[in-house]
Swiss-Prot record:
Enzyme Commission (EC) number: 1.7.1.13
Protein name according to UniProt: NADPH-dependent 7-cyano-7-deazaguanine reductase
GO biological-process terms attached to the record: queuosine biosynthetic process; tRNA modification
Subunit structure: Homodimer.
Gene: queF
GO molecular function: preQ1 synthase activity
Subcellular location per the Swiss-Prot or TrEMBL entry: Cytoplasm
Organism: Shewanella frigidimarina (strain NCIMB 400)
InterPro entries per UniProt: GTP-CH-I_C/QueF (IPR043133), NADPH_dep_7-cyano-7-deazaG_red (IPR050084), QueF (IPR029500), QueF_N (IPR029139), QueF_type2 (IPR016428)
Length: 285
């Protein structure tokens, strides 16, 4: 089994997070509640430095966005945020939830004012580009539930005895005599929160070109995240790097959609050849 030094055990950037701590909920606007985690922590561990081998975005959906209008009447909306992966920080999810809760008893003159506030604060926390969309109730009927594209590999009849993260499952995991372009997906992705070890449930799509990947080996590899502690964004980047390394994909996209917690879901997208699709939720989200 391949072992790596834990990059998080002594990370100063994780010491002050509200995640895993008892916290009071604030109902009035407070941008200081947002907390960022340096992307560099994980990228150093997977030997990513300089120019990244992928582009992409972290797509967040917030289902519990509410504020007061100028007359004090409550307003609700769905929030969609796209955070560029070149930002210095990812946004820690509990702090994001606490920050959104701080809108609940705060008056805003318009939806545009809410959107501008969110854009400014999230960009400042992430130190990067952020796109914010506030979806009003009159547009809720446009929200769709879809399946991830591709062939699902979850019905493979395999025996599993190992649940610790192990990229060695991918060794010898391709047929070099068969070059293909295909899209595979699995609903069996589970990892755990880096700080609290609470389960994170997700579905993942792998679209690639290159030597044909052994689906059984890929499924075993994905299942090996089951006891792995890492943030969503970090897991997806780790999958991308491992597939490029072990499977020699010439083109690759990894896209995961995680179930929501605290009214927020996180959907990291990484690719070296295509752009993110329109964000539509899956049934479990």
């Amino acid at each position: 089994m391949t072992h790596n030094h834990d990059p998080y055990s002594d990370a100063a950037a994780l010491k002050g997070l509200t995640l895993g701590q008892a916290t009071a909920y604030q109902a009035e606007y407070d941008a200081s509640l947002l907390q960022g985690v340096p992307r560099k922590l994980n990228r150093d561990a997977i030997q990513l430095s300089g120019e990244l081998p992928f582009h992409g975005t972290d797509i967040w959906t917030g289902y519990e966005l509410s504020w007061l209008n100028a007359k004090g009447k409550p307003v609700v909306a769905i929030l969609e945020v796209q955070l560029d992966i070149n930002s210095v920080n990812l946004i820690e999810s509990k702090s994001f939830k606490l920050y959104l809760n701080s809108f609940n008893q705060t008056k805003f003159d318009s939806v545009e004012a809410v959107q501008e506030t969110l854009s400014r604060d999230l960009a400042a926390c992430a130190e990067g580009e952020v796109t914010v969309k506030v979806i009003e109730p009159k547009h809720f009927n446009l929200e769709r539930i879809i399946d991830l594209p591709g062939t699902c590999i979850d019905d493979l009849d395999i025996e599993v005895t190992e649940y610790e993260f192990n990229p060695d499952h991918l060794i010898g995991g391709t047929d070099p005599d068969k070059n293909v372009a295909e899209t595979l997906n699995s609903n069996l992705l589970k990892s755990n929160c880096l700080i609290t070890s609470q389960p994170d449930w997700g579905s993942v799509m792998v679209r690639y070109q290159g030597p044909k990947i052994d689906r059984e080996k890929l499924l075993r590899y994905l299942i090996s995240f089951r006891q792995h502690n890492e943030f969503h964004e970090q897991c997806v980047e780790r999958i991308f790097v491992d597939l490029k390394k072990y499977c020699q994909c010439t083109k690759l996209t990894v896209y995961a959609r995680y179930t929501r917690r605290g009214g927020l879901d996180i959907n990291p997208y990484r690719s070296d050849f295509e752009n993110p699709p329109e964000s539509n939720r899956l049934a479990r989200q």
